[in-house]
Amino acid sequence: MRDLVKQLKSEKHTAEFDALRIKLASPEEVRSWSYGEVKKPETINYRTFKPEREGLFCAKIFGPIKDYECLCGKYKRLKHRGVICEKCGVEVTLAKVRRERMGHIELASPVAHIWYLKSLPSRIGLLLDVTLRDIERILYFEAYVVVDPGMTDLEPRQLLSEEAYLDALEEYGDDFTALMGAEAIQRLLRDIDVEAEVEALRTELQTTTSETKTKKLTKRLKVLSAFLESGNKPEWMILTVLPVLPPDLRPLVPLDGGRFATSDLNDLYRRVINRNNRLKRLLDLNAPDIIVRNEKRMLQEAVDALLDNGRRGRAILGSNRRQLKSLADMIKGKSGRFRQNLLGKRVDYSGRSVIVVGPTLKLHQAGLPKKMALELFKPFIFSKLQLRGLATTVKAAKKLVENEGPEVWDILEEVIREHPILLNRAPTLHRLGIQAFEPVLVEGKAIQLHPLVCTAYNADFDGDQMAVHVPLTLEAQLEARSLMMSTNNVLHPANGEPIIVPSQDVVLGLYYITRDRVNAKGEGMRFADAQEVVRAYENDQVDLHARITVRIKEGILNEAGEIEESDRLVNTAAGRILLWQIVPKGLPFALVDQPMTKKAVTKLLDFCYRNLGLKTTVIFADKLMYMGFHYATHSGVSIGINDLVVPDQKEAIISRAEDEVREIEKQYASGLVTHGERRNKVIDIWSRTNDQVAKAMMEKIAVEKVKDAEGKEVAQSSFNSIYMMSDSGARGSAAQTRQLAGMRGLMARPDGTIIETPITANFREGLNVLQYFISTHGARKGLADTALKTANSGYLTRRLVDVAQDLVVTEHDCGTEASIEMMPHIEGGDVVEPLRERVLGRILAEPVMDPKSRKELLAKDTFLDERRVDILEEHSIDRVRVRSAITCEARYGICSMCYGRDLARGHVVNVGEAIGVVAAQSIGEPGTQLTMRTFHIGGAASRATAANNIGVKSTGKIKLRNLKTVEQAQGNLVAVSRSGELVVQDLQGSEREHYKVPYGATISVRDGDSVKAGQIVAQWDPHTHPIITEVAGTLRFVDLVDGVTMNRQTDELTGLSSIVITSTKQRSASGKELRPMVKLVDKNDDDLFLPGGKVPAHYFLPEGTFLTKEDGTTVNIGDVLARIPQETSKTRDITGGLPRVADLFEARRPKDAAILAEISGVVSFGKDTKDKGRLIITAPDGTTHEELIPKWRHVSVFEGETVEKGEVIADGPRDPHDILRLLGVNALANYIVNEVQEVYRLQGVKINDKHIEVIVRQMLRKVKITQPGDTDLLQNEQVERTRVREENEKIIKKDGTVAKVEPILLGITKASLATESFISAASFQETTRVLTAASVAGKRDDLRGLKENVIVGRLIPAGTGFSYHQQRRAVAGKSVEEKEIEEKRVTASEAEQALSEALKSSAPQEAKAAQKDE
């Protein structure tokens, strides 16, 4: 009995496993899998359609074709289970074994596996230390290789050509062995003593000094130690036995008309078997060497094609001239096994249809067509019908459902009640692309969708389709209801703002009823309460827009979270009172006492969610929607051609601009301005004109003059339909209105350059032919761009998801002390992102102190919600240290304290949340909104850079930060550092403005001074760079020879003479060696030193410098000794939009990157080479660092200046790798976060910083070993952080030296491929390469990430699956004995079930036998 239970259990359960390992298969292993050798290339008999014996479909090897029936028909039915037929040799069993039984082919000659040969770096090549070309020559029989030199003077592994081999034979006879082909390689591989080689390499590595050699040795050592650790043997990379795939995985399907469709693999296998058999025959016949050799080569090529067709030589083509699909093609690429069948499957119980709007639905409902529902819920209906006794069998139930009788519809209603369905719209760019709803049955064939979830789906009703899925199990329904219901997804996971917000018609309706109008009917009436207003409005006594006075009841939340009610009188518009009727208690009236634009409605809902909770918000959102639709219909707002009012001043403005352009053309003709300047000026003029026309138009459309009650004329906001639509945020924008009624303005060509002649007409007036074609010219490019953008954006999302997919919240607190500092993001005089937005929802890493009383305001580990962020703002604190994903020390995944708030839920993130994927989706989803083009800087932008002063915008106090200054005799300060900032704080002490202060700027205020708005606090000359002295003394010239290194020039206007340093190219041979400079000396002619160091005050003068002082002059601190003219930096293209984001995440090194200072110290210039300048930085302790910089690079530092480590010394885009190396992880994170946000901010997309931080954390997973210490790690090897930590912990226990590491930055593609999990990497990109590397190393995949678990078909270890896996691991940890005891116990019900199943499936006598046994 127990055995019976065990057998039935075992048939049901799949094997439990915790990890997957991939290894090379030895020939013995291949034979052990096999059920027999395939000897013939035949497939099936063309007459009987039965498989040929010993052929590719042989039933004897692979199993029967029909269940429990042998091929010749002698044994049929279940009772013969397990019998092997003596006539045809087929085992009687299930036919599905033909999916799992393998065969094999014994190869007559060994064959190299193409992956280990050709997949770079070639593993066979590395092991033998022979180049790939040479190995190919041996394999394809073009050269001999010496396998055993014996006593001769040949080298082992030396290649011999045919002639050389014959010569050697003559010379040495049989003293040596040389072979060719795979046998030779196999023999060489077999002779390698892996252990000895590893030892030898390790010793050699310690002695060698050359960089290239170390690299080469490390490569070999890696592969060899992989073989050593994994237990793979090198000779297994050469195949002697070829496994044959089970036949049902390479089927042969009869088509109508007697033809067959077959898998390409059968062709490839046939080819191998044919050649193998021919080779066997030739060997038996002792055929001539050259024929055998040719056959062996052909066999090698056939096996290559089977494993990876097209990897070497020409691909083998099928009958229809297309490449045959080999085994490698089966698994790689978009239509390979991984991406097509394992990561994405088609599912049952699903359907799709067009969507239409469902304005009467509640937020949690979706309208499901009856026809669809009937089909989707069929099994549920069948079981209900049988349960009710309306049908006795499934067949009867089916008939009832097909007839669609009334009882079926009643049961359908019952079945779908509270059974959620999932709706999905492709493309599913983020998790809100699939949400759950309760179905409501509707007539017709279209799915009805609630308008408020359109934003999340990015759906509109112009023919979009959506798919419906039915969650079947109870758990699935539970999760759908509690986690995926649309009512539970009110906030956007990317930024934590509401996403269930009204848009378009609803906004227009709400905006319309909350506007007020002068002199409307009922103006000035007074009402006792809101009900009276409603009655008055319904009886036409008061207009929607009339200003009235009403007594309202207002409930406000107090500190304790209770609602306190109070009465007050308000003067407001009647429509706002109608809206107030539906506003839940607890919201202040001020939120609706304004025209309700989209922004205002969003704010209202956000406030409601944060203060009154989810349920109230959802009900309120629905009410808002019904009201908005109602009054939008009522308002009668529509669009007519007369709504587009062209301003009267337009003609005048345009003719003025045309005059200006003519003037500039004249200047250009007379040579006063260059071509580039003319172009930029013209474009500037037209941009300005366009703005002026637009302004005139908006003034005309936005305001209308009306008479008030006294008959006076007053201005009020206009009721123009177009203005109302764009002002409310329902549809359209100022830019679009400008094209309709202003002027269309400048257009771009397809390459992005701007056409100088603008379109002066607008759409109201109509375009002429030329204008029409100008506008279509750039427009077509826009359409082409959109298509490209979608693909690019999708690929970026895929890479992001792949790199972050295994990042899950694994613990509550990792206990780290590390943190990052947050401050407001300020550029110049504008706060781009205030501190509150940056720290909201984070956890404090250090207590926050009150700057005035030094008392603790907030303790460490406080969760910063809205209320606590308000405290920070009240005390104007502008720097806090918070926990961050980058500094989290959780071993796998991340901890909830470091992550902070789950943006989509509003509380601290739960353990098990898949934050990696959420981050990837949040960054990828708005990708399609980003632009694709690179910007050319020109016109206004390029001239704005030449600023020459700092004027503060707000009144406050000055703080000088990191600013090194010297004081001049007149009392002004002069900046002598370049990374300094000037900060303006407001009266509360919050930072409002940040300004960079360039070297040599004169600063007219001191630290702590008060300034007024508009005051100029610093000035400098943007076109020259001054050399400023920091010490007082006497000036001495060095190497300044008149006529050689310098010339005197006299200014004709002023008569003043100045000294100019000549260019090195113009000097005579003797002058080339001279290095012109000035130095400062004291009274005794001894060198003076710069303050705080041993660096003499020498100032090297580059070519073109103007000297303003003469030799021997006395100078004071802060005096300008010389001026170096600055050419304004060339306009270069700025990569923007999507390509910029991709560059940042791929951590690409920019072209001509900025050169950063490697150490802190004083700058001096050494001897130049031919085309490079030499820059030397001397640290305070005397160590120096030299940097050779190409002459054409613009060096932004000067002799004698002090630079900090990581400061820019030659301009250019900064390289993230340099930032990481010199300034550390936090600076890098800050850089990437700000740069990515910059791109999204331009498009008005909000993404929380923490999502970008999560991706950066994944890019920093790996470290480089700088000193291996006593660990087994190799120098310069890239290893996961966690692995180094584990290795070091082991070493610490043994009191050894630990490995030292430095962080490295990997781009997202590299990081995905370098992940610990080979399954995840293989399913991402470069499948062959990943699998080759993994199999050689005998890699083990612990299935930690989400992707690996999806691929092996398990619950993912995130969300609800997280606890499931934890329990599984806990059970796995139990002792083996406990498990066995549990297995032995058979419950009564189990026994009964087992018995009944056994009786069902077998003949009566077997049941008798089972009873006897008992």
UniProtKB/Swiss-Prot annotation:
Q: Which reaction does it catalyse?
A: RNA(n) + a ribonucleoside 5'-triphosphate = RNA(n+1) + diphosphate
- The UniProt regions of compositional bias labelled Low complexity, in chain numbering, are 1392-1403
Q: Name one GO biological process term.
A: DNA-templated transcription
Q: Does the keyword Magnesium apply?
A: yes
User: What is the top-level taxon of the source organism?
Assistant: Bacteria
Enzyme Commission no: 2.7.7.6
Q: From the UniProt annotation, give the residues forming the signal peptide.
A: none
So which cofactors does this thing need?
Answer: Mg(2+); Zn(2+)
Any GO CC annotation of this UniProt entry: DNA-directed RNA polymerase complex
* UniProt keyword list: DNA-directed RNA polymerase, Magnesium, Metal-binding, Nucleotidyltransferase, Transcription, Transferase, Zinc
Residues holding Zn(2+) 2: C814, C888, C895, C898
* InterPro entries for the chain: DNA-dir_RpoC_beta_prime (IPR045867), DNA-dir_RpoC_beta_prime_bact (IPR012754), RNA_pol_asu (IPR000722), RNA_pol_N (IPR006592), RNA_pol_Rpb1_1 (IPR007080), RNA_pol_Rpb1_3 (IPR007066), RNA_pol_Rpb1_3_sf (IPR042102), RNA_pol_Rpb1_4 (IPR007083)
Q: How is the cofactor bound?
A: Binds 1 Mg(2+) ion per subunit.
Region (Disordered) residue spans:
1392-1414
- Binding-site residues, Mg(2+): D460, D462, D464
Residues the record lists as binding Zn(2+) 1: C70, C72, C85, C88
CDD domains the record matches: RNAP_beta'_C, RNAP_beta'_N
* A GO term, aspect molecular function: zinc ion binding
Cross-referenced SUPFAM superfamilies: beta and beta-prime subunits of DNA dependent RNA-polymerase
Free-text function comment from the UniProt entry:
DNA-dependent RNA polymerase catalyzes the transcription of DNA into RNA using the four ribonucleoside triphosphates as substrates.
Family, according to the entry, reads as follows:
Belongs to the RNA polymerase beta' chain family.
Stated name of the protein: DNA-directed RNA polymerase subunit beta'
Instruction: Supply the source organism for this entry.
Output: Coxiella burnetii (strain RSA 493 / Nine Mile phase I)
